[in-house]
Regions:
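A composition-driven surface/loop motif
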Residues: 1-120
Length: 120
């Protein structure tokens, strides 16, 4: 698993309501979210750090940011593509995933992504 995958999945999951999942499902879901959150929080911090590190020394408000953006994107993408210890995301039964989808009225692409990532 790369960091980008963990960040993207947490970004989808962080606002979802759990609904009436089974005890096993809710426990696994919460523990997985906590592991993903560690990577997401690291991402939030590293974005700021990389932005500061790549900011041109003579930059003034209103200056063209194209070069800065290019350098920043290269650095953040390098970080996002780093491998991490795999986080088991295939933790939910069909019933628990359906409960999660119903409780949150999720659109089709989110349902597809969650099915791909969360079903045992």
């Amino acid at each position: 698993m790369i960091k980008k995958q963990a960040v993207e999945l947490y970004a989808i999951l962080r606002e979802l309501k759990n609904g009436s999942m089974s005890k096993e499902g809710i426990t696994a879901f919460i523990l997985m979210r906590l592991k993903l959150k560690v990577v997401f929080d690291e991402f939030e911090t590293i974005k700021i750090d990389i932005s500061k590190e790549t900011k041109p020394e003579d930059f003034k408000e209103g200056d063209d940011v194209t070069e800065w953006n290019t350098i920043f994107q290269s650095a953040i993408n390098e970080w996002l593509n780093e491998e991490i210890e795999t986080i088991d995301t295939h933790i939910l039964s069909n019933e628990d995933l359906i409960e999660l989808v119903n409780k949150n009225d999720l659109v089709g692409w989110m349902q597809d992504k969650l099915f791909e990532k969360l079903i045992k």
